[in-house]
Amino acid sequence: MEELNIKQILFLAIFLVIGVVLFQPIISYVNNVTTSGTYTTIISGTLTQTSFVSNPNYVGSSNAPLVSLVPLFYLIVLIVVPAVVAYKIYKD
């Protein structure tokens, strides 16, 4: 019984560490694929030129709202799984 709790606590710690470490790269990637592009301004003397540079990784306007929810669901899983494991440990 004690060894089972140690395994569960170890799983919980590893899960949280990996989850927290991967959270920022996931947010960065989602921001990358949901941004259609950027505006670039070039100033040469008195001439100002603005151009739009499209993002080749853009998922499209219809998919962007769904993809932008990925970090939210990831955060929910990161909260719910440890809560369930902690409840099972507490219950035993």
Curated annotation (Swiss-Prot):
Keywords per UniProt: Capsid protein, Membrane, Transmembrane, Transmembrane helix, Virion
Membrane topology per record: Multi-pass membrane protein
Keyword Transport: no
Domain of life: Viruses
Annotated coiled-coil segments of the chain: none
Disulphide-bridged cysteine pairs: none
One GO CC term on file: viral capsid
Record keyword Transmembrane helix present: yes
Chief place where the protein resides: virion
A GO term, aspect molecular function: structural molecule activity
Assigned protein family: Belongs to the fuselloviridae capsid protein VP1/VP3 family.
Official protein name in the record: Structural protein VP3
Species annotation: Sulfolobus virus-like particle SSV2
Gene behind this protein: VP3
